[in-house]
A protein has these predicted regions:
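Charged/polar positions within long, soluble alpha-helices
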Residues: 23-30, 53-60, 85, 104-111, ...
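Alpha-helical scaffold segments that form or flank carboxylate-/histidine-based iron centers
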Residues: 6-14, 33-54, 88-92, 117-132
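Sparse recognition of residues in long alpha-helices and their boundaries
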Residues: 27, 34, 57, 63-64, ...
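Conserved alpha-helical segments that form or flank metal/cofactor-binding pockets of metalloenzymes
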Residues: 39-73, 136-144
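Carboxylate-rich helix-loop segments that flank metal/cofactor sites and access channels
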Residues: 57-103
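Preference for long, well-ordered alpha-helical segments
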Residues: 98-148
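Alpha-helical bundle segments that constitute or directly flank the non-heme di-iron/ferroxidase center
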Residues: 2-32, 90-114
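Membrane-interacting alpha-helical segments
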Residues: 1-8, 75-88, 140-148
Length: 148
């Protein structure tokens, strides 16, 4: 098990954020009109679910049993704002806004001096995947805004 109750509380909060973000991305992918936006949004949903699973595995097994594989290769509180028939650009814009909240939660955990070293390593690995996904969604937003 993790080193202390503080680690568990912090990681459970991140699991909730990542799970909610995954669900928001699934909904956004369903709302998207074209493959150009739907596919990357669905991929982000899978990645966010992988982040949540990574953190859950840490809580179940503890740091000694955690695999050291690259989290991004294991691709399997946030809400997409719904509107009537949103455009792909609007759907992606909502996802980008939600990314900021998720990223801030991970950054707060990494800044937490009370977090144990094994928990911090687990959170950092998940944060790298979150940050990469954030950058890719922002790139998609720019591409949709700037046109084909």
């Amino acid at each position: 098990m993790p080193a202390n109750a503080h680690d568990v509380e912090r990681i459970e909060t991140l699991i909730a954020y990542a799970s909610a973000n995954a669900e928001a991305y699934r909904e956004a992918a369903n709302d998207a009109e074209g493959f150009r936006a739907a596919a990357p949004l669905a991929h982000r949903a899978q990645e966010r679910q992988a982040v949540a699973a990574h953190l859950q595995a840490y809580l179940r097994a503890g740091p000694a049993d955690e695999s050291s594989g690259d989290l991004t290769l294991r691709a399997p509180v946030v809400a997409v704002r719904r509107a009537a028939a949103p455009t792909d650009a609007e759907v992606v814009e909502a996802a980008v806004r939600d990314e900021g909240e998720l990223q801030a939660a991970f950054e707060a955990a990494l800044d937490d001096r009370a977090l144990s070293a094994p928990a911090r390593e687990t959170v950092l690995k998940a944060y790298v995947a979150v940050r990469t996904g954030t950058d890719q969604i922002r790139d998609l937003r720019r591409a949709l805004r700037d046109g084909p």
